[in-house]
Amino acid sequence: MPRKFPLEKTRNIGIMAHIDAGKTTTTERILFHTGKIHKIGETHDGDSQMDWMKQEQERGITITSAATTAFWKEHRINIIDTPGHVDFTVEVSRSLRVLDGAVAVIDAKAGVEPQTETVWRQATEYKVPRIIFVNKMDKIGASFDYAVKTLYQRLGINASPIQLPIGSENEFKGIVDLLEMTGVEFLGTSDEKFKTIEIPEYMKELAQNKRIELIEKMANYDEELMMDYLNGKEITVEKLKNVIRQATLKADFFPVLCGSAFKNKGVKKILDAIIDYLPSPMDVSSIVGCNFENKEIIRKTSDNEPFTALAFKVMTDPYVGKLTFFRVYAGTIKTGSYVTNATKQVKERLGRLLQMHANSREEIKEVYAGDIVAAVGLKNTTTGDTLTSINDDIILESMNFPEPVIEIAIEPKTKADQDKIGIALSKLSEEDPTFKIYTNRETGQTIIAGMGELHLEIILDRLKTEFKVEANVNQPQVAYRETLTKISTTEGKFIRQSGGRGQYGHVIIRFEPNSDKGNEFINKIVGGVIPKEYIPAVKKGLEESLSNGILAGFPLIDVKATLIDGSYHDVDSSEIAFKIAASMALKQTKNEGNLVILEPIMEVEIITPNDYIGNVIGDLTSRRGKLENQDSRENTVIIKALVPLSEMFGYATILRSNTQGRASFIMQFLKYERAPKNIAEEIIKKRN
């Protein structure tokens, strides 16, 4: 069946912003004006079309990227609505990976906000072309000039208005189009009716100056336009629009629009700008992957190429089960076809193909290059996997997600909850690559880890509402370790005589540090002073004792144990006696005074605006942090530091507070390091 919409008339876009900048409302209005919905939902009323998860409607924020398809002026627009809260940046990241363009929504009063900076960096990393919509022009305190100024100051980008607002706050009533040099006055209707007017007299000079600024910027991108401008020729609307498009497609220039989505002012102009300036799949570079021999393979965006797609999201749907969202980069595929999951090397069947609208769906028979769809039936596919035609051998670059930075211990409230909690947690972690589950071997606790307190709060909420699982949460333990600092030779002798056969085991073992090489056992017994059948028992006794620790019950690591001597008894010696003797020898090292507590050290990378460097560094120092590196980029600084894990609990909240939410951080385990004496004494005291 031929495709309904040619590739050049397809747009895959995301809508991104800081929390509360109005991006879900903007998406709602786009869907309303494109005829996709018949009643406008309001985020603050909890009935927004795109925010379909119960937790989203309660909080009025977007958590998962809802995908939907809309139509405007014979173009198909696939839209992903992304979250604005810092704990859900992974949703933004994976959406940007599969999109061709984006609309960045900023608040006319607040300008560029913290999460705008974070999301902007992610979009820049993926080289996503963007247009900017200055929203809430009707808000008290709205200032278009201020909002545009923050684009330069906080993002350091090359942007220019292509519209100007007529009035602001309660007086906001229209816009000036700097390309057409005409005015538009909104009539205040929900379908955004407007009339074309002349530019108000008091704005004519400003509009003329802003148009000249725009043309001068565009002259840098097109020699013909530059010559026409220098020669005093009239720059046509068509020519200017074409050059703005080329500059925007390079992700080197960002057109700025304005309006009020809530008041239905300027939304249709966003739709026009999406078509005019954002790329179709054909404008985007060919997709590059590797085959199994690591040779580069290039796929063009064409229906005639072999089927190639990237899975970017997994969701559990209450009606159809597991839904896998994927972006088709090349080729076509029909419902019921088999595909290869090239990443995992397994064959999968596409049970059903669905075009999604928030949480409702439309079944389709075939998908084409450039499409974003959801599939039912992909059992083994997870986020970042490549899907190809059978026997094809291309793997696309997967997605990298930050490690979780906050964790809590969790336990089921009842026996019934215990049976369900494992399945529920594994389903949730399948959906979200930044949500991790593991068991703490020392404490036996189940630990859940995520990107922030709100992230884990939502997980616990979903456990309760979707999976009907009640759970208690505790504070997690830090996984400390113990080790030796110098060589010591100790003796372990276990003799027990209580009538009948006794017990006898005797060993002499040399213990020494084995830096970063793990625990090691070496047998140096010669001449049969300990029969070889008892050697495994000595090793086993040491392994068990090492895992239980000596100072505070934490596992001993990086210890080399060499069995050098001992003795045995013909009748009384046994495996158990030698196990106990080995354990006694290890415990003797405590008397040598060479055991220490090790603490996990995290490598922490913080990205903060220049204004907050002092706050951030001061706080890190108070957490026993060691600064490793400081690197300035545009208006931000990247600080690298080594900090003990025990000092990092609650850090996300403190960092937000210290930087007004404008900094972000990632951390990962680096090494174990000797804990300072006072810290070690405190740990031992607590454990004993």
Swiss-Prot record:
Transmembrane stretches, start-end: none
tr-type G domain boundaries: 8-282
UniProt cross-references to CDD domains, sorted A to Z: EF-G (cd01886), EFG_III (cd16262), EFG_mtEFG1_IV (cd01434), EFG_mtEFG_C (cd03713), EFG_mtEFG_II (cd04088)
The entry's keywords: Cytoplasm, Elongation factor, GTP-binding, Nucleotide-binding, Protein biosynthesis
Keyword GTP-binding: yes
Function: Catalyzes the GTP-dependent ribosomal translocation step during translation elongation. During this step, the ribosome changes from the pre-translocational (PRE) to the post-translocational (POST) state as the newly formed A-site-bound peptidyl-tRNA and P-site-bound deacylated tRNA move to the P and E sites, respectively. Catalyzes the coordinated movement of the two tRNA molecules, the mRNA and conformational changes in the ribosome.
Name the UniProt record assigns to this protein: Elongation factor G
The organism of origin for this protein: Phytoplasma mali (strain AT)
